[in-house]
Amino acid sequence: SHTDSICTGCARGCNMETWVRDNIVKRLIPRENMDVNQYWMCDYGRLNTYKFINDEATRVKSPMMREEDVSQDAGGLKDCDWDDAIARVISEIKNYKGDEIAFIASAYSTLEDNFVLQRFAKEIVGSDNIAYIPHIEGEDDKLLLRADKTPNANGLKLLGIEPINGKFIDKILNKQFKMVYIMNDSLGRLERTEEIAKSIEIAVLHISNFYEQSHKATVVLPSATYAEINGTFVNFQSRVQRIKPAVATLEQERLPGDFAVSRLDKFGAHNDRWTKGTRFNARPAWKVISQMAKVLGSEFGYDNTEEVFDDIAAKIPALAGMSY
């Protein structure tokens, strides 16, 4: 099957098709958009940006949490169900004041995920401590590939979420921020990574793949990747572009016309190999955060990603009148 989407390898957002078989991404090929990438796609995006989606060795396969009497350095993360993981996050939030909790948004996440995280931080937790880790400059080929390797920094600017600065880091190191919620990003992109990780009392990671410091988390929530969700990114031209799901997860959001199914997938029998691909137990961040808000007594009222975007378009003047 192949599904129209965009590349998330840099700030350009080349239009592409995601080709999938056995629920595994097999290739990415360029899709014509004369305003963004014409007919082309760089080798970095075409060959590298999907590998983590298929990487069963590092994918987070289940919610996990640490037993309350086990230290960071002792390991102790164990599989649990979604309800228990969310209940643990809520329990930890209730232990702290709003200004003791920080949220790290992500320039790798959709506009919808970041918007709902921002609402949760400010409206539910009562925290203005939300920022994102800025991009690290990389190669710029002056044709397609941009130096900014994050696909949604402009989306964060639209939402008014600022890059992490020295003052924010100092508050972590000085333990003024006692609990940190990190969405779809890695502390490894910050300087003094180990020192920062050790300074956090409670760390909640909403991530798709494990990384070096993730074993220090209190709770790990499996995040769906860009190939498994609906959503939008804002590229370096300030062009709003959609991603669509091509890979199935255990809980799949389906909007009309958004999920391609090949002839083989559609007509495969239960004993056919192509019907047996791994479906990860991952959810989009906006959905999990909305559930947390509901547990805390506030209903955001979103049933799908499109409704989140409609709310964003109603509140952000630059997006007024836009829809899926």
Predicted features, each with a name:
Residues 66-69, 80, 95-96, 113-114, ...:
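Non-catalytic alpha/beta scaffold blocks inside enzyme catalytic domains
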Residues 11, 107, 184-186:
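Short, flexible loop/turn elements at secondary-structure junctions
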Residues 3-14, 41:
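Cysteine-centered iron-sulfur cluster-binding motifs in ferredoxin-type domains/subunits
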Residues 19-99, 145, 157-159, 247, ...:
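Cofactor-/ligand-binding subdomain signature composed of acidic, glycine-rich
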Residues 7, 106, 281:
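Glycine- and other small-residue-rich loops at beta-strand/loop junctions that grip anionic moieties
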Residues 100-106:
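Short glycine-rich phosphate-binding loop at a beta-alpha junction
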